[in-house]
């Protein structure tokens, strides 16, 4: 027994010694089971610490913070070691079953030893991770990105605009760029595209800041958006505006930034907000969007860009994308109908998108035809129009400060779609409706009207016409104006606005008693046989119809009517006697009608202040009318059969309030005489010299200081001379500038006698010149005469500097326009025909027009 035991001990020692010599430290096998138990326990502790840490991280991330990189790294390493330990423990049972000699050795010694080494290594690794898994702080504020991407919906035609804006912004000298345009035109989308373009490369900028300003946002609201973008999310309610400005300024002073301000309605004081001055040295820039061009000026931009509606092709492309292919392919007629719907949007992206989406579910021809009918008759009733389009556009209306300016704007909705109305005509309506004080002097009231028009154009509620004398209204803006004028559709009966819709009769469904304004202009109405009781009607527009007859009783019950326009009804030869019942009438326009006489009862219109009888070729006389209208301020007889003669001059002198006179004169002596009567000549704005025969006529630029339009028709005048001096009340009157101050239109037709029109040098503000069928004219400006004028008046050097339209036609002897063809920087149209001796004209002026 003892010998046996002694032998076992001897063998173990021998084996262990051999193993130790051959394979190193036996502890890898001897302590395998203990290390495995320690590894499992430590691993469990590590997983618990990991779970606790993850809970803390989630809480902080929910607050908008970002986990620390070292925390994320630790968690990643824990994840890796968990996987490795799990794989290691899968071999635990196999390796422990191989142990022998009371755990001193393994039946597969090499495998057991290697396993033991891995267990010990993992144990130490896990212990190390456990020791490092103690974090006081697990997350921090997310650093602000240099630029935040903005979501942009499907657009068309944007790339070109972005390119233009980007190129302008990136100019070294550019500091502030204003993007202006009407509501819904895509200004915000353009600004967002500029923002996103910085994602492609910062171009040396440190930060791009986006701020939505909106209409009623105060400075502090702008400041808090900037502070948030700078990563300063602390509460700012207890901090003053000045302190916030200081924080912002201190940070932005050391950065090269781009500040994008969306939807400005008025000037923003950048200094009060804390935006440091933009200089060439710091290179920072500001871009903003606005509906008003005035805001661009108030912000003192050094660059501005108008965002226009889409051209027809691009508008159709956008509309198709919003509608989708299914409706457009559901019937062969729908694409044609869809184009009509798209045309109603007039290129406004907001309308194209909203209406396009609304039409995406309509797949029958009948549905599309119904929509076209709705859009033609009452667009605001179209689904989504009142909810998504009109309210957006209404912000521009709400921003108008003066209630009378708002009334002026709403009045513009009475005209047809795409109709260009003359500014002068619009102002006359407004004055008689009481929107502009008519008691001011003529220049004051007229200037006020032009100021209102300018403000509406700059607010993109009106648009410039093809000619500078006209404006128009975008169709969608017009729908918005009608919607507002009808109290948002609640009082539609107060308006009857159906111009240009091919009516042959006055509609029968009119609520005459509630009616306030009616526009049936540009229709096919020939007869008005009905009578009406319309106690509240103030404006009635019937111009440009086919009127032949108006019922005797039609005007009998319109006591509040102020504005009546019957112009451009060439077959209308008489007015009913009941017109005398229009006791409130202040404005009547009978121009371009066939009126032969004014009814005797016309004298009862005692409140009439504006009478337009221009282009009335059949009107024989107005003797006695003028003296019966004591309040008359505007009398227009330009190109009328009624010419100024001695008796009419005497009658006109009795009009104490006369401010504007347009006249037709046949007699050269009358022309000379009227230029000597201050009260009359000072009011002349347009003058037609018709069938006049005289060797010489003299036009006095002092006397005719208010002349805007001169027409010479069918006359024989050898020479036209200009005088800039005249005697009045015993003293000599002259002007430092010898020319016509306001003369902008000269039209000469069938003039016989003069060889040149050098006197036009005195019309330095001329914008339109038409010379036709005047067979003796050899040149417009004669060299010798021109040089003699410029020698005396050196400030008259370059002729036609403001000319926009030039027409020379049927001038058989015309050899040249001017001896030294001037540059015409503003020329928009040059029309030359049947001037056989003018070979150079066709190439001479278009070149200047395009410069």
Swiss-Prot record:
Query: What are the LRR repeat spans here?
Result: 514-535, 536-557, 560-582, 584-605, 607-629
Which UniProt keyword terms apply here? ATP-binding, Leucine-rich repeat, Nucleotide-binding, Plant defense, Repeat
One GO BP annotation here?
defense response
Q: Locate the NB-ARC domain: which residues?
A: 139-441
A GO molecular function term, named singly, is:
ADP binding
Family annotation (SUPFAM superfamilies): L domain-like, P-loop containing nucleoside triphosphate hydrolases
Binding-site positions, ATP = 181-188
Family matches, as Pfam families: LRR_8, NB-ARC, WH_DRP
Q: Does the keyword Repeat apply?
A: yes
Ligase found in the keyword field: no
Protein function: Probable disease resistance protein.
Q: Please report which protein family the annotation says this sequence is part of.
A: Belongs to the disease resistance NB-LRR family.
Q: What information about domains appears in the record's comments?
A: The LRR repeats probably act as specificity determinant of pathogen recognition.
What is the name listed in the Swiss-Prot or TrEMBL entry for this protein?
Probable disease resistance protein At1g15890
Taxonomy, top ranks, is: Eukaryota, Viridiplantae, Streptophyta, Embryophyta, Tracheophyta
């Amino acid at each position: 027994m003892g010998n046996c035991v002694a032998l076992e001990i001897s063998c173990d020692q021998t084996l262990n010694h051999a193993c130790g010599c051959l394979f190193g430290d036996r502890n890898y096998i001897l302590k395998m089971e203990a290390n495995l138990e320690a590894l499992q326990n430590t691993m469990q502790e590590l997983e618990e610490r990991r779970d606790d840490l993850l809970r803390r991280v989630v809480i902080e991330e929910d607050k908008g913070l970002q986990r620390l990189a070292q925390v994320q790294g630790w968690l990643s390493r824990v994840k890796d070691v968990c996987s490795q330990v799990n794989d290691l423990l899968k071999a635990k049972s196999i390796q422990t079953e191989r142990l022998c000699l009371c755990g001193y050795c393994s039946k597969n010694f090499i495998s057991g030893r290697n396993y033991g080494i891995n267990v010990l290594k993992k144990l130490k690794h896990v212990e190390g991770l456990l020791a490092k898994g103690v974090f006081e702080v697990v997350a921090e504020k997310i650093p602000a990105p240099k630029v935040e991407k903005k979501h942009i919906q499907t657009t068309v035609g944007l790339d070109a605009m972005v390119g233009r804006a980007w190129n302008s912004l990136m100019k070294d000298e550019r500091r502030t760029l204003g993007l202006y345009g009407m509501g819904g035109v895509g200004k915000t989308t353009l600004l967002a595209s500029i923002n996103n373009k910085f994602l492609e490369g910062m171009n040396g900028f440190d930060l791009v800041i986006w701020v939505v300003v909106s209409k009623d946002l105060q400075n502090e609201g702008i400041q808090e958006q900037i502070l948030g973008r700078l990563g300063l999310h602390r509460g700012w309610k207890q901090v003053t505006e000045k302190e916030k400005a200081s924080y912002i300024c201190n940070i932005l002073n050391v950065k090269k930034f781009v500040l994008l301000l969306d939807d400005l309605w008025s000037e923003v004081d950048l200094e009060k907000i804390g935006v440091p001055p933009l200089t060439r040295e710091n290179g920072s820039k500001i871009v903003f969007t606005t509906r008003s061009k005035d805001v661009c000026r108030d912000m003192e931009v050094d660059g501005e860009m108008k965002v226009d509606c889409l051209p027809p092709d691009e508008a159709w492309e956008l509309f198709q994308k919003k509608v989708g292919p299914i409706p457009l392919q559901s019937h062969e007629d729908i694409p044609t109908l869809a184009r009509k719907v798209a045309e109603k949007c007039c290129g406004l992206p907001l309308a194209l998108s909203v209406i396009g989406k609304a039409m995406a579910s309509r797949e029958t021809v009948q549905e599309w035809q119904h929509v076209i009918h709705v859009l033609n008759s009452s667009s605001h009733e179209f689904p989504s129009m009142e909810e998504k389009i009109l309210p957006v556009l209404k912000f521009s209306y709400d921003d108008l400060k003066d209630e009378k300016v708002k009334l002026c704007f709403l009045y513009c909705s009475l005209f047809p779609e795409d109709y260009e109305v003359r500014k002068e005509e619009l102002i006359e309506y407004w004055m008689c409706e009481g929107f502009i004080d008519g008691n001011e002097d003529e220049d004051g009231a007229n200037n006020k009207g032009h100021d209102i028009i300018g403000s509406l154009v700059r607010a993109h509620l009106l648009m410039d016409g093809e000619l500078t004398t006209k404006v128009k209204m975008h169709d969608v803006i017009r729908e918005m104006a009608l919607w507002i004028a009808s109290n948002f559709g609640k009082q539609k009966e107060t308006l009857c606005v159906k111009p240009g819709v091919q009516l042959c009769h006055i509609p029968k469904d009119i609520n005459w008693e509630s009616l306030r304004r009616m526009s049936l202009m540009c229709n096919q109405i020939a007869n008005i046989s009905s009578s009406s009781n319309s106690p509240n009607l103030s404006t009635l527009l019937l111009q440009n119809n086919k009127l032949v007859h108006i019922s005797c009783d039609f005007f009998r019950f319109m006591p509040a009517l102020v504005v009546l326009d019957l112009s451009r009804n060439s077959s209308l030869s008489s007015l009913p006697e009941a017109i005398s019942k229009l006791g409130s009438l202040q404005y009547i326009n009978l121009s371009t009608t066939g009126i032969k006489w004014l009814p005797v009862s016309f004298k009862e219109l005692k409140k009439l202040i504006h009478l337009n009888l221009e282009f009335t070729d059949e009107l024989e006389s107005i003797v006695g009318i003028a003296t019966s209208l004591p309040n008359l301020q505007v009398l227009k007889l330009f190109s009328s059969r009624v010419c100024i003669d001695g008796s009419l001059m005497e009658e006109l002198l009795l009009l104490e309030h006369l401010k504007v006179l347009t006249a037709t004169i046949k007699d050269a002596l009358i022309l000379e005489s009227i230029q000597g009567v201050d009260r009359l000549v000072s009011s002349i704005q347009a003058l037609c010299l018709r069938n006049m025969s005289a060797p010489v006529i003299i036009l006095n630029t002092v006397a005719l200081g208010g002349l805007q339009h001169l027409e010479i028709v069918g006359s024989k005048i050898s020479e036209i001379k200009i005088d800039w001096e005249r005697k009045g009340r015993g003293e000599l009157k002259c002007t430092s500038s010898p020319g016509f101050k306001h003369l902008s239109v000269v039209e000469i037709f069938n003039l016989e006698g003069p060889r040149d029109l050098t006197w036009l040098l005195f019309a330095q503000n001329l914008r339109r010149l038409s010379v036709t069928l005047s067979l003796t004219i050899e040149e417009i400006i004669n060299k010798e005469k021109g040089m003699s004028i410029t020698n005396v008046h050196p400030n008259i050097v370059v002729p036609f500097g403001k000319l926009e339209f030039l027409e020379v036609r049927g001038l058989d002897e015309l050899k040249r326009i001017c001896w030294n063809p001037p540059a015409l920087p503003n020329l928009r149209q040059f029309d030359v025909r049947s001037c056989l001796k003018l070979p150079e004209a066709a190439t001479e002026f278009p070149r200047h027009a395009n410069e």
